[in-house]
Swiss-Prot record:
<dbReference type="Pfam" id="PF04475">
    <property type="entry name" value="DUF555"/>
</dbReference>
<comment type="similarity">
    <text>Belongs to the UPF0212 family.</text>
</comment>
<protein>
    <recommendedName>
        <fullName>UPF0212 protein MM_2357</fullName>
    </recommendedName>
</protein>
<dbReference type="InterPro" id="IPR007564">
    <property type="entry name" value="UPF0212"/>
</dbReference>
Length: 129
């Protein structure tokens, strides 16, 4: 079994905002309320979009008529998945249950090695003695 870091993207609608910073704050707050405290292992951040002209990255926020569309990024680690596709399905299922009616798109899936925690090292050291 392998471990994966899965990054998902969602479009979050925020009403009655005047600035991009307000929209970002409200979107992250609303998403966080839906995810926490059950899913405190999911990281929430604002996505970035590249400018089509100059290529510079900027926050994924679009405002029109005091309504904003904010691109949010959700990151989580999936342990003991059979494959990258399996990790994608697990992440979409876990996050999707809390964020009903919010479409999720997979941005990136990377495999990682599970590091041994200090407590586990001490336990192993005691077991070997």
């Amino acid at each position: 079994m392998k471990n994966f870091h899965v990054v998902l993207e969602a479009a979050w609608l925020v009403r009655d905002v005047k600035t991009a910073d307000d929209a970002i704050g409200v979107a992250i707050s609303e998403a966080g309320k839906r995810l926490n405290p059950k899913l405190d292992f999911v990281e929430v951040d604002v996505g970035t979009t590249s400018c089509p002209v100059c290529g510079e990255p900027f926050s994924s926020v679009f405002i029109a008529a005091n309504t904003a569309l904010v691109g949010l990024i959700f990151e989580m680690k999936v342990f003991d998945a059979e494959s990258a596709e399996h990790a994608e399905r697990i992440a979409k299922s876990v996050i999707g249950k809390s964020l009903r009616d919010v479409p999720l798109t997979v941005v990136e899936v990377t495999e990682f090695e599970r590091s041994v925690e200090k407590g586990e090292q001490q336990q192993k050291g005691k077991a070997n003695k």
